[in-house]
Amino acid sequence: MERKFMSLQPSISVSEMEPNGTFSNNNSRNCTIENFKREFFPIVYLIIFFWGVLGNGLSIYVFLQPYKKSTSVNVFMLNLAISDLLFISTLPFRADYYLRGSNWIFGDLACRIMSYSLYVNMYSSIYFLTVLSVVRFLAMVHPFRLLHVTSIRSAWILCGIIWILIMASSIMLLDSGSEQNGSVTSCLELNLYKIAKLQTMNYIALVVGCLLPFFTLSICYLLIIRVLLKVEVPESGLRVSHRKALTTIIITLIIFFLCFLPYHTLRTVHLTTWKVGLCKDRLHKALVITLALAAANACFNPLLYYFAGENFKDRLKSALRKGHPQKAKTKCVFPVSVWLRKETRV
């Protein structure tokens, strides 16, 4: 009886962290944007899925190819691509959920994994990007003094620590699964009585998962600019290490401004100003859009690999050559076949 009563309460989506039920004030105004979600989320999620699988799948293939020189940068980028690919694999299920009018058909366990995967990907991506930028900065400023910090072994250890911390800190999201509301099975939702806990979780995630990495990136960017202003740049341009460090941090900051900061900002505003019966449709829709942008970071990260990766372009060309060996063979076989034809005619 108690569970049935709680299922009738307004709910808040775990992944969007936004009201997901229908609330009514004195004027009986409908406070839901289910139609907007149904039209927006499926197509956006499927686009992200297509490009994300293409970009990250190819990137992982390139990173795993044997190469004469491997660096810690490639280790961080490989882990980032794996994180993105794991998250992207859940997007078709999310698209199906909203296409069915927020009706979940894939079972309780899969429902619990949805929210968990979103936040594990988001914050592991943030920390992989941050650590990658810091390592690039240290390699530029102290290329020989900090070799132990930028070694491949240290990179794998640091990646393992990031995975463990992010997965452990997000474990509480596995508490909430699917819930039957009449003929509809809801997913990605928490009951309203957990709003205080949700606000606390949001503040912790905002500070530790967004603001701290953002300030770290900003400081690295300013220090790199300071170093470049002191260094005499030759006519050939910046040194390779300087250029790659600057490119890495600039692309990472762009991803932060586009994907992570808008979502964390609007999520915080939405949670702190939300009240039962108070409709804020524009803020609600804006939050939905920023959530999609946060998910789209999985599509933007391959650009970082291409423009700032260590030997990524050379590795990509080498991998593509391996995928098309027939061209090299036909150049050698064709003259032989012509000669054989001439011999048979004689």
UniProtKB/Swiss-Prot annotation:
Membrane topology term: Multi-pass membrane protein
Compartments, record wording: Cell membrane
Residues in compartment: Cytoplasmic: 64-72, 145-153, 226-245, 308-346
Any one cellular-component term (Gene Ontology): plasma membrane
Organism domain of life: Eukaryota
Family: Belongs to the G-protein coupled receptor 1 family.
Name of the protein: Cysteinyl leukotriene receptor 2
Species whose genome carries this gene: Homo sapiens
Gene that specifies this protein: CYSLTR2
